[in-house]
Structure formats: C-alpha cells, structure tokens
Amino acid sequence: MVELVITEKRDNPILKRKELKYTLKFENARTPSREEIKEIIAKHEGAQKELIIVESNKQLTGKHEIVGYTKIYQDKASAMLYEPDYELIRNGLKQKEAK
C-alpha cells in the first residue's frame, strides 16, 4: 500500500508549473522508482506523467517513507525551457547525447 501526502503545494504561473512537496509512505512494499512516483503523483493530481519532473527524493532512515519535491508543468515546452538538461534526462524528457 502506497500513500501520498502533499505537505506543500504552490502554483508558479510565471514558470507555468505547480510545485509540490510530499511524503510518500509505502508499508510492506519496496521503495518506489522515479517512474512509479511520477505515476502516483499524476494519478493524485490529474496531470500527465510526461509533464512531471521529480527533482528530489530522500528516503528517511529506518522508515518506509520518502520525502520529495516535484514540479508539474502545464506543457512540455515550458519544462524544456526551464529545467536543466540533467533533470530532463533523469525524468525521460530528453535523451542523453552520445559522445
């Protein structure tokens, strides 16, 4: 069972996004992956999974909880404009360039 608790929600109209701080509790389950966290947040907020940038996740020592920060963009163009390349790659919005 996974439970999402939004601890802080802020609209940022200038950057065309919502910013969320959350606690994700997962009793008797493995630690959710970044993709699974995006799916949980998308379902909870009614957003498209592709527009969610999971910036940070910190698992609390000795607990089955993650404290995290994520951004939900209104459109992909805004995410591509405001997010650094490494975040876009990490969240699957951009492919890593081969050297």
UniProtKB/Swiss-Prot annotation:
One cellular-component annotation, GO: ribonucleoprotein complex
Gene Ontology terms describing biological process: translation
Domain of life per record: Archaea
Gene Ontology molecular-function annotations: structural constituent of ribosome
Keywords linked to the UniProt accession: Ribonucleoprotein, Ribosomal protein
Gene3D superfamilies xrefs: 3.30.70.330
InterPro entries: Nucleotide-bd_a/b_plait_sf (IPR012677), Ribosomal_eS24 (IPR001976), Ribosomal_eS24_CS (IPR018098), Ribosomal_uL23/eL15/eS24_sf (IPR012678)
Family: Belongs to the eukaryotic ribosomal protein eS24 family.
Protein known as: Small ribosomal subunit protein eS24
